[in-house]
UniProtKB/Swiss-Prot annotation:
It comes from Caenorhabditis elegans. GO terms for biological process: ADP biosynthetic process; AMP biosynthetic process; apoptotic process; ATP biosynthetic process; diadenosine tetraphosphate catabolic process; ribose phosphate metabolic process. It holds the Pfam family NUDIX. Changing residue 79 to M: Slight increase in substrate binding and reduces catalytic activity. Belongs to the Nudix hydrolase family. Changing residue 31 to V: Increases substrate binding and reduces catalytic activity. GO terms for molecular function: 5-phosphoribosyl 1-pyrophosphate pyrophosphatase activity; ATP binding; bis(5'-nucleosyl)-tetraphosphatase (asymmetrical) activity. Mutagenesis suggests that interactions with P1- and P4-phosphate are minimum indicating the enzyme may have a wide substrate range. Asymmetrically hydrolyzes Ap4A to yield AMP and ATP. Residues 1-132 form the Nudix hydrolase domain. This is Bis(5'-nucleosyl)-tetraphosphatase [asymmetrical]. Changing residue 38 to K: Slight decrease in substrate binding and slight increase in catalytic activity.
Amino acid sequence: MVVKAAGLVIYRKLAGKIEFLLLQASYPPHHWTPPKGHVDPGEDEWQAAIRETKEEANITKEQLTIHEDCHETLFYEAKGKPKSVKYWLAKLNNPDDVQLSHEHQNWKWCELEDAIKIADYAEMGSLLRKFSAFLAGF
């Protein structure tokens, strides 16, 4: 059975440059990802993405412009089980400070190449490149 999760790849525009928000997990190996989490019973991926972003970074749907037509699903193994994570691209309209939950210990705004390096796995790099290309044509 595939474990389903969802999240938002949040970006901001600062001095004409695009930066992506990454959160660092509180538990080893302390990986960096956009806000995301498991889909709860009775929820769809969209609802989970919105809820998890609020829980993990204290960013609400009202603070975002979500590009509903720009989304991608990643598939990989986590803890020996197949997992899918659907991400939508979202702009933070007023980039206030992020407020982390206990699940994360740090956060960063990163330009594309730095975000790819810090996320440190190929699928996330491909996703960030795809979303960056979408924004270049937006």
